[in-house]
Amino acid sequence: MDGLPGRALGAACLLLLAAGWLGPEAWGSPTPPPTPAAPPPPPPPGSPGGSQDTCTSCGGFRRPEELGRVDGDFLEAVKRHILSRLQMRGRPNITHAVPKAAMVTALRKLHAGKVREDGRVEIPHLDGHASPGADGQERVSEIISFAETDGLASSRVRLYFFISNEGNQNLFVVQASLWLYLKLLPYVLEKGSRRKVRVKVYFQEQGHGDRWNMVEKRVDLKRSGWHTFPLTEAIQALFERGERRLNLDVQCDSCQELAVVPVFVDPGEESHRPFVVVQARLGDSRHRIRKRGLECDGRTNLCCRQQFFIDFRLIGWNDWIIAPTGYYGNYCEGSCPAYLAGVPGSASSFHTAVVNQYRMRGLNPGTVNSCCIPTKLSTMSMLYFDDEYNIVKRDVPNMIVEECGCA
């Protein structure tokens, strides 16, 4: 994982970053990196939070005035951290936006989202805070992909979707569905009767590019509306083949006779563009920490959690991150007296690994003092565009610092 430039971290803290446990927003430090908005004042010289000697194992950490453009460096480190957690090499190149009508329709169907007066999408639980109930549960990634069309394939309509597997080669598809809008045109029916049609969705069989399987559904229609068709098997086969393009052929029996129109890719019907939703399970380790840490309130110099918020609009990322609007990049700061050392939990084990590395290098571990570092990290839900203009809803683990401790 990327962190601050090498000049800003000592060997011990670099080891913690390499372990994938400490994020750039969560550095243990005697002096915290300043924040973009309302940064806390630097600790006075000689205070527990202001001395470099307080945390010898992070001895490479420099005071803000020694780093020059620390604000820019810090924001770049946060950007790299977010991209790393999303398993992306760089931010997506958004050259043309998905039609907002199509996006909003999909989000409303799946997340009960709404559009604010300023045009931004607001979705419950995607506010930059930790995801409720996410820790200790299975991680599930959700991908929304909108249809494109190759035109007609005999009597069927060919749709295709580019579906990203989120950088994970071993995703297990929990559920996947095609959402298709069926529109009713004026038609004379007997009172109380409905229009009954049969929709067939064809997808390529695994291992046989020239053979197609079919999902069939009989639909009784009283009004225009959305209908779903299961595609779990098709998407799982796609991932197992290592492919990204999903080809679907759609056929509707009796639609023409009964004045039923499946809406495909029509510039005049963007809010009804077909889309595929994939829910896939992510295997990720879970951390359970027992001890609750202090909040920085300006009245203590002991190890505590400092909160701050980064608005994605201010760093130019609001074009590809739909929700949340920003990131709570909390970090740890403060002194670690001897009586606070050895907080139980993952932090202790990582600190032990660092000390062992010092021993291997012939250094005296007795000179390595405790560092104020994260002891609990939580999950954050994000909704964003990937390079293929899929809308991805993902619960990203270890994103937000919840508690700090000494180790």
From Swiss-Prot:
Dimeric, linked by one or more disulfide bonds. Inhibin B is a dimer of alpha and beta-B. Activin B is a homodimer of beta-B. Activin AB is a dimer of beta-A and beta-B. Interacts with FST and FSTL3. Activin B interacts with BMPR2. GO terms for biological process: activin receptor signaling pathway; apoptotic signaling pathway; cell differentiation; cellular response to calcium ion; cellular response to cAMP; cellular response to cholesterol; cellular response to insulin stimulus; cellular response to interleukin-1. Residues 29-292 form a propeptide. One of its GO terms (molecular function) is protein homodimerization activity. Keywords: Cleavage on pair of basic residues, Disulfide bond, Glycoprotein, Growth factor, Hormone, Secreted, Signal. It comes from Homo sapiens (Human). The gene is INHBB. Residues 26-62 are annotated as: Disordered. Belongs to the TGF-beta family. This is Inhibin beta B chain.
